[in-house]
């Protein structure tokens, strides 16, 4: 074998090894997450008990704001958990015993509120029909409710039934749209990134928890 051919094969083999590694490069965990880790673990234990996954809530906060406590979205969502003002006012009433005078800009309160809201949404996700509803799908539906409102999701699950697909399978429901294409694309991407990419990344970085979607 000539040295030129050997060199070409070596370059190709190195590319085949390195390319997948680059494609699956780890998520960069913001340094700011360390400032809030104790609070995340504290509220997850309070809201979920031993079955909670701090890594999941951390992943959601990462997606929402990148852990920036002064984050404000173009549409007006506020703080580390990105609550809209109307949602924040509703939560101040709904979770008054737990939150007191709720301020969405206060990261201590907002992290607690995010966990409470996730629990509230998850408890409202119910199976439709006779097919099983997995924990992964329940969480995906709850996350979609957090991001885009549970009303839209219920309409889309209804469209899924009308389309003779499984309204309890989050990936099948993704194919059906009741809202505009832009909001729908954002809404289906939201749980995918949190549950399939970010939660495993936080677990790999040492945060406690178990990935709900595998």
Predicted regions and their residues:
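N-terminal Sec-pathway targeting helices
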Residues: 1-9
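Non-catalytic cell-wall polysaccharide-engagement segments
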Residues: 4, 21-38, 50, 89-116, ...
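Bacterial N-terminal signal peptides
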Residues: 8-17
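Short, charged helix-capping/linker segments at alpha-helix termini
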Residues: 44-54
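Extracytoplasmic
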Residues: 52-56, 62, 75-78, 138-139
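Soluble periplasmic/extracytoplasmic beta-strand elements of cell-envelope proteins
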Residues: 59, 82, 142-144
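Cell-wall polysaccharide-cleaving catalytic domain and substrate-binding groove, primarily
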Residues: 62-87, 149, 194
């Amino acid at each position: 074998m000539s040295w030129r051919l050997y060199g070409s094969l070596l370059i190709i083999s190195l590319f085949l090894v390195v390319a997948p590694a680059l494609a699956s490069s780890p998520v960069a965990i913001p340094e700011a997450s360390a400032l809030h880790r104790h609070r995340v673990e504290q509220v997850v234990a309070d809201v979920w008990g031993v079955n909670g996954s701090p890594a999941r809530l951390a992943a959601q906060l990462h997606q929402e704001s990148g852990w920036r406590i002064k984050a404000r979205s173009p549409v007006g969502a506020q703080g580390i958990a990105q609550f809209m003002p109307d949602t924040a006012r509703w939560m101040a009433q709904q979770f008054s015993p737990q939150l007191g005078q709720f301020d969405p800009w206060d990261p201590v309160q907002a992290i607690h509120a995010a966990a409470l809201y996730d629990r509230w949404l998850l408890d409202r996700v119910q199976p439709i029909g006779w097919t099983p509803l997995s924990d992964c799908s329940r969480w995906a539906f709850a996350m979609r409710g957090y991001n885009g409102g549970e009303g839209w999701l219920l309409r889309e699950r209804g469209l899924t039934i009308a389309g003779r697909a499984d309204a309890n399978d989050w990936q099948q429901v993704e194919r059906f749209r009741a809202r505009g294409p832009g909001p729908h694309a954002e809404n289906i991407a939201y749980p995918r990134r949190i549950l399939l990419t970010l939660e495993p990344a936080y677990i790999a970085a040492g945060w406690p928890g178990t990935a709900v979607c595998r």
